[in-house]
Amino acid sequence: HTFYDWDDVVLPDMRSEEFNWDGIRTNFQGISLDYRRFNSDSILDCYKLERDAVKEYTPDIPVTTNLMGFYPSLDYQKWAKEMDFISWDSYPSFGAETENNAMAHDLMRGLKGGKPFALMEQTPSVSNWHTYCALKRPGMMRLYSYQAAAHGADTIMFFQMRRSIGACEKYHGAVIDHVGNENTRVFREITALGEELTELSDTLLGARTPAEVAVVFDWDNWWATVLSAGPSRCINYYEEIYQYYKALLNLHIPMDFVGVDDDLSGYKVVIAPMLYMCKDGYDEKIRSFVKAGGTFLTSYFSGYVEDHD
C-alpha cells in the first residue's frame, strides 16, 4: 500500500485486509497492527480529556478508571502512564483455574511498577453475563478477595451495592439483594470480610511483592501474534505467557509483569515468551541485562519482526 492522503487509509476489516477462518487474521499485519494502536490511543485520548476536565477543579484528587485484566483491545501499559493508580474489575469465570485470575491481578500490579492496585469491582454473589451465571458458594467471595489482597490489592470493593431494578443488571449480584435487607448470607459474608480486613490493614496496606523474576508482556506482541496468518493456527501468545506464569506460581516464585519499556536492572531472571516483535532498542536492553549478570529466557516464535511487523 502507498498512502498519499489520510482519506486513502482503508480500515482493516473483512472488506479489505482481514479474514476470519478461525479468528481474525490479516494479509497485511502492519496496517492491521497500526489500526489496533490507533484504536487504543483514541479511546485513551477520551479518558485523558475526561481526566483533565476533572483535574482542572480537583487537581489533588487521584483519578483512575476501571481496567479489565487481560483485555485485548486496549494497551494498558500506555494507559497506566496516564492513571494516578490502577483499578480493575475482576470477574473470573465459573470453574476457571485460580491461576488465571491470579495472573490478571499480577498484571495489574505490574502496570505501575509493583505499586498496590484497587479491586474496583467484583460480584459478591453472581454475575449476569457469563455463560452460566452460577452463585458463588459460601466462602468463595472471601477466597477471591484474599487472592486479590495477596497479589497487591489495597482495596476490596464490589459491584453493586444494591441490585438494579431494571435492565440486565437486575440479574447481577449485590451487597443488598432484591429482598432489600441485610438478612442474607451474602451480606453477612461481606460484613465478616470487612471486619477481617480492618484487623489486617496495618499489615496489608501498601505492601509490596519483592520479585527477582520478571515476565515480559507486551500488547503489540499480543496483537501481532493474534493477527499473524502463519506459521501455525495454534500460536497463542496469552496461553504461552500463562503456562510460564502458572509454573512460577505453583513453584511459589514471586514475579512481576513488565513491559518492554520497563527497567530490568532489579531482576535476576527475565522471561519473554514468544517475543515475536523485538522493538527498536530492545535487543540492546537484553544484551545489557545479560552482560550485567542477568539470565534472559525466551521461546519459539521470537525475534521475527520489528515495531511495524
Segments predicted by a language model, with ranges:
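Active-site neighborhood of glycoside hydrolase catalytic domains
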Residues: 1-82, 264
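Carbohydrate-binding surfaces of carbohydrate-active enzymes
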Residues: 13-14, 18, 32, 48, ...
